[in-house]
Amino acid sequence: MAEAAAQYRHKEKRRGRIKKSERRAQILLELKLHPHVRISELARRFDASTETLRRDLDALAKDGLIDRAHGGASAPSQGHYPTLDQRNAARSEERERIAQLAAAQVRDGETIMIDSGSTTIQLARFLAYRGVTCKVITNSLPVAMTLGHGAAEVMLCPGEYLPDESAVVGPETLEFLSQFHVDRCIIGASGISDEGVSETVRGFAAVKKEMLRRASRRQLLVGSEKFGKDGLARVTRLDGLDTVVTDARPDGSLLRALSKSGVEIVVAEPSGDQKA
């Protein structure tokens, strides 16, 4: 991987200055190889001004892709946030129930936005298995690839690629999403409480917000282990949702807040029965 990065830099240096999006993608690659990068070193490598690189790092930090540090940046600490592979291995039975029930609600001919996440990957699998002829816009590579084996027409967003999440985020992703209006969006989240829906990674929170803005019907797929939890970035208030599909009915303040906000709660029971 280090050799590939070196070859990439050498090739781009011969061709001249690279595009902003390519430069930022390369910065993310550098942080996969090294725990810390300095602005002065990046400026030398990319033959760009330190002010340009400072703006790059500020933008990546704003999207939650890196941690800003004095004179440079470091890879974001992910000890508190499991990778996509780790999340896929956890609570798989509950996640499949949620995804299967959500997939059953999708109709042929619908236009849908689906975000990245372990549960939405399972949703894509069930949609492909059913052969639903919908049109899907997604920022998730696994979702796009899975639906590509079915009857769906798929558009994959551009943006900054996150290898651990197999997804794209950033300004280009948001600009792409802003061009469309869809029948429904289906998103996941890191947490849901009476304060609203939240996400640990700010870049993902921004994508979810834009998808919610662009949809007539807004659905959240969330496991009961995330009830009462608040992530770093707010995605929406509860009244920004139409439906929550989950594996267990919430109680207490969360249930009261959802009811007050008029959110439909659909529970995927172990037997496969639906409870509203």
Region spans (language model):
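Short glycine/serine/threonine-rich phosphate/pyrophosphate-binding segments
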Residues: T119-L123, F227-D230
